[in-house]
Regions:
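Long, contiguous amphipathic alpha-helices that act as assembly "spine/axial" helices in icosahedral shell
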Residues: 1-62, 86, 92-110, 230-238
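Proteins with a high burden of low-complexity, intrinsically disordered sequence enriched in S/T/G/P/A and R
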Residues: 1-6, 47, 67, 143, ...
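Residue-identity detector for glycine
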Residues: 4, 28, 41-42, 52, ...
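Intrinsically disordered, low-complexity, compositionally biased regions/tails
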Residues: 46, 56, 64-66, 196, ...
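Extended, solvent-exposed, turn-rich assembly/linker loops in the middle of proteins
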Residues: 52-136, 140, 144, 148
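Sequence/fold signature of self-assembling virion shell proteins
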Residues: 121-274
Length: 274
């Protein structure tokens, strides 16, 4: 056990990099998990996205189903969609419930659709009183939102996450864990925490006789080997789950104009039968 032994830890860090790989794998899974909660209001673990436990059914984060919104028109229809109006409508609806939206989080490719919309270009051009060709950027749109009565203080935040996940067949793929068509409305960017507890092996004397162990953040790492024939294993595990601290203050909009599916019950959490 190298807990509290800086010299032993340094030796392990120098000799082996396996612990970095397994640690990053756990952190990557939690990034995937958090992005799913923020963009879908829940998650599903199945054989196509997880090599361990499966839920098969959607597990919500507790966000009220009333907070699930749908754009009036698919944002990809640049001549008829009005993303700025969709954003304003959601901010106003949240305000009526006592929620002050400050951030609208979306993927970069979704913002690319927003800035090409005819209605958006005309609104921004009229606001700055510019007749010639206008270059729409995140900075310009954020300045526009800040100047409007209903969206004062609202800022668009762009994300482009990328993580590697493993399925039940142990095939690894790189994915963007943020649901492509969805955007998230938040009061605070720090909208959740990772709740975690101890792992039984952490305090097992017998376990530590057979393995070198290290606790990094909430991730428990262990390394052990056999001599004949020589084999070595490194494992990282966490007894943890990400949670949205105030799901009532989070809103998610589908910008493809499609209704939420019946199975996406964001209000139903793992405490209700999963």
């Amino acid at each position: 056990d190298c807990e509290g032994d800086s010299d032993l830890k340094s030796i392990l860090d120098l000799a082996f990099k396996d612990q970095d790989f397994v640690y990053n794998a756990v952190r990557g899974r939690f990034e995937w998990w958090c992005m799913q909660l923020m963009s879908k209001g829940g998650f599903v673990l199945n054989s196509s996205n997880n090599n361990g436990i499966v839920t098969e059914e959607f597990v919500g984060c507790g966000m009220p189903n009333e907070n699930k919104k749908v754009a009036a028109v698919d944002w990809s229809k640049s001549t008829t969609a009005d993303g700025l109006q969709d954003i304003e409508d959601t901010v106003v609806a949240a305000s009526a419930e006592g929620v002050t939206i400050k951030y609208v989080v979306m993927r970069k490719d979704r913002f690319a659709l927003l800035k090409k919309q005819k209605a958006v270009i005309e609104k921004v051009r009229g606001w700055i009183n510019q007749k010639e060709k206008l270059t729409i950027s995140k900075k310009v749109i954020n300045e526009y939102l800040a100047a409007q009565e209903n969206t004062e203080g609202v800022q668009i935040v762009l994300v482009s996450p990328s993580v590697r996940i493993e399925n039940a067949a142990h095939q690894r793929t790189t994915v963007n864990p943020w649901e492509a068509a969805n955007i998230c409305f938040l009061e605070d960017l720090q909208c959740g925490d990772v709740q975690h507890g101890p792992i039984a092996a952490e305090h097992s004397v017998e376990y530590k006789k057979k393995a070198s162990t290290l606790k990094k953040d909430f991730v428990f790492i262990s390394k052990w080997s056999e001599l004949e024939p020589f084999k070595e294993w490194t494992k990282a595990e966490a007894n943890a789950i990400p949670v949205i601290n105030d799901p009532d203050a989070m809103y998610i909009m589908k910008t493809d104009g499609q209704a939420w599916t019946e199975g996406e019950d964001t209000e139903k959490t793992d405490e209700e039968g999963y």
